Amino acid sequence: MCNDDTVNELKKDFHYTLSKFSHEIRNPLTLINSGLQMIASAHPEAEDYEHWDDVMDNLSYVRELLDELSAFNNAGRVKPEATDTGMYLKTVLSSVKPTLDYLDIRLVTDIPNDLPTLMLDRIQIRQMLLNLLKNAWEAVPVPGGQISVTAFTEKSGICINIQDNGCGISKEQLASIFQPFFTTKENGTGLGLAISRQVAEAHHGSISIESTPGPRQTHE
């Protein structure tokens, strides 16, 4: 059985390896992307090539994967600051409202003004919330989708409930939903929910999902 020192050393090695891997991949990826942009600039007809969009989409996917690997690597290391949680949540939700309006998805919110001030890493909590909201809006029907977000004080913290009228997932999928790289989406990285759980736990919280096949899914 590993002792705490061994576990911590393994974690440090893992974080270092993941960071180095991301760095080593990102540099040539940037050069490839720049090279393709130069080709397109010098030879506009290149964009008419039938697989050009596929190439650019794949590059975008790898960039997104590297960004999420970096977020996953840093999710447990927080820089908390005193945060008015009510105002903060309203700001985050306002930032996604234009996207949801464009997609014709209704956003219903109930965020009290008297939520407590908490020590939060605002960048990481924002990413966690955006991951959960993105999961919701990708699951709901368009048009006709609805996402409800409520928050309330619970013990020494708050509970945030995100509910949607999407298609839901099976019990088997639910058992693996927080595992890194597990995804039910064709172009998903499978890291969003794993990152979200790490962020919640780094703030001494937890995250859970209730879902069954059919409409209605809840994140807390």
Predicted ranges, named:
Residues 49-99:
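Conserved DHp (HisKA) dimerization/phosphotransfer helix of two-component histidine kinases, i.e.
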Residues 76-78, 117-120, 184:
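Conserved micro-motifs of the catalytic ATP-binding
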Residues 101, 106-116:
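Conserved catalytic submotifs in the C-terminal HATPase_c
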Residues 146-156:
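Short beta-strand/loop element within the Bergerat-fold HATPase_c
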Residues 169-181:
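Short conserved segment of the HATPase_c
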Residues 192, 196:
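Short alpha-helical Gxxx[C/S/T] motif in the catalytic ATP-binding
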